[in-house]
Design a protein with these regions (language model features):
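Lipid-handling modules and contact-site tethers
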Residues: 2
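Structural signature of tandem-repeat unit edges
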Residues: 8-22, 32-45, 55-68, 78-97, ...
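Consensus positions within tandem repeat domains that build extended binding/scaffold surfaces
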Residues: 25-27, 47-52, 70-75, 99-104, ...
Length: 172
């Protein structure tokens, strides 16, 4: 089918086959072998905690077609450095939804974070402990931020932030 349900292999580089639209819930959870994941252009959604605690994961090439990154998708991927979009900011332009703590404790994720125009709300704990992020751009399409906050807590290398002019309230 069009959903990758589970991967339990020990390859260091995993190429997800073309035609896969969804990476399922917990599909790669706790896999310490994978270093790189190459996603197909057909990919539209990454499931709940799909890459949870993949300690050695360093890069994931996310296609521009990706629409949804669910809750905790890359939670505790402490060595994740790149999502394959270094020219256009960290995230694919097609994204419309990023779940709670999607990139929680991705402390190696580098560069200038640009939230895509399709996103309207920022979930709690989104880039918590994003120590290597250097700037954050939040487009005017974002009108709310989860009141539980910590979207960018401890992003200590950030030197520049551009906020949406349509945000009426920031979390505490």
């Amino acid at each position: 089918g069009d959903t990758l349900v589970s991967y339990s292999g020990s390859e260091s580089t995993v190429t997800i086959p073309d035609g896969v639209r969804v990476i399922g819930e917990n599909a790669f959870k706790n896999n310490d072998y994978i270093l790189n994941v190459i996603c197909p252009d057909s990919l539209e959604q990454i499931g709940y905690r799909a890459f949870y605690d993949c300690d050695n994961l360093q890069s994931v090439s996310l296609p521009e077609t990706l629409k949804v990154i669910n809750e905790g998708a890359f939670y505790y991927c402490e060595n994740l450095k790149t999502l394959g979009h270094t020219d256009d900011g960290v995230l694919p332009k097609g994204l419309t939804s990023i779940g709670v703590k999607a990139f929680y404790f991705c402390k190696a994720l580098e560069g200038d974070l640009v939230i895509p125009d399709g996103v309207t709300s920022l979930s709690a704990g989104l880039f918590y402990n994003g120590f290597a992020l250097t700037s954050i751009t939040i487009p005017d399409t974002v009108t709310s931020m989860d009141a539980n906050g910590d979207q960018f807590a401890n992003c200590t290398a950030v030197t520049s932030v551009k906020l949406s002019k349509n945000l009426t309230e920031l979390p505490k």
